[in-house]
Amino acid sequence: MATPNIDWAALRQAANEAATHAYVPYSKFRVGAAALVDDGRIISGCNVENASFGLTLCAECAMVGQLHMGGGGRLVAVTCVGNGDHVTPCGRCRQLLWEHGGADLLVEVEGVPTPMTVLLPAAFPEHSNFDNQTKN
């Protein structure tokens, strides 16, 4: 696959803007995520904490919600910031990003565009659980 023309600075700016909207009364750790969609849109999301930390919504999850609210599509490139610095998506979010961008999705890691195959080399295949259930 050819590398698309990605304006990483614009994505970082969108992620930083998203982080300003984070609801973080407990950790004070503001996270923003932004992505380029295959139709050219830039989408973003912020983290939303909960007193029960396990229920905290990661910025990447909010961003994927925005993807679908805007009509869907495939993620091409993603960047995440936490309190203004690069952060790498957690394991749950890596799987979520794989579902919506696949192996060719690029994620900025410490300023370096990194394919999802490096971040999540043994990803759970999309729809595999449901495909297996329908075969039985």
Which residues fall in each region the model found?
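Short Gly/Pro-enriched turn/cap motifs at secondary-structure boundaries
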Residues: 23-26
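Compact, glycine-rich, soluble single-domain proteins
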Residues: 47-61
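Alpha-helix C-terminal capping segments
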Residues: 36, 66-71
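Short, well-ordered amphipathic alpha-helical segments that serve as non-catalytic structural scaffolds
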Residues: 14-17, 59-67
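C-terminal binding/interaction regions
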Residues: 2-18, 70-136
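Short beta-strand scaffold segments in enzyme catalytic cores
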Residues: 28-37
